[in-house]
Amino acid sequence: MIMAGKVMKKLTVSVASLALCALLLACPALAETSTRGAVTKLLIPRFVSLKTSEGNVRRGPSLTHRIDWILKLRNMPLQVVAEHGHWRKVLDFEGAGGWIHYSLLSGARTVMIKKDTVDILDRPLPDSAINARLQRNVLAWLSACELEWCEITADGYKGWAPKAALWGVSAEELFE
């Protein structure tokens, strides 16, 4: 009888695990939003920006780890993919990653233009008037995002850009 109880528990756990896996596969957005950082309890992954004009990116989460490179673009968007104590593992817009101290990061939202050229439009409509044309790797401030469009400001120009042309905002993100 004890054996049957253990088998039943294992079967119940296995069925529950399969159901959870099926749910997460059917709803990728749910899988992404359900991950929280162990330290901050904020969503992982999430986007932040570099607070300073220089930031050391290290091989691991401590001062004893070697510096792999130095970020030199203030307000550069970064994606936090892990947390460990006062350290955040980040990826830049080219996919390079490493660990950076949390004090060098800001919650201010910025994006990089990831297409060769992007028209910044007056309204979030494809046939709207063009306010500016931005080139690849231009840094812009993020103000708001709708389903397919984000309002950005770069070099004094403000307008709407297709979300797919920006790095620093996730596809499902909406905010004002």
Tell me the role of every PLM-derived stretch.
Residues K9-L11, Q79, Q135:
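Residue-identity detector for glutamine
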Residues A4-A19:
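Bacterial N-terminal signal peptides that target proteins for export
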Residues A26-P28:
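N-terminal signal peptide c-region/cleavage motif recognized by signal peptidases
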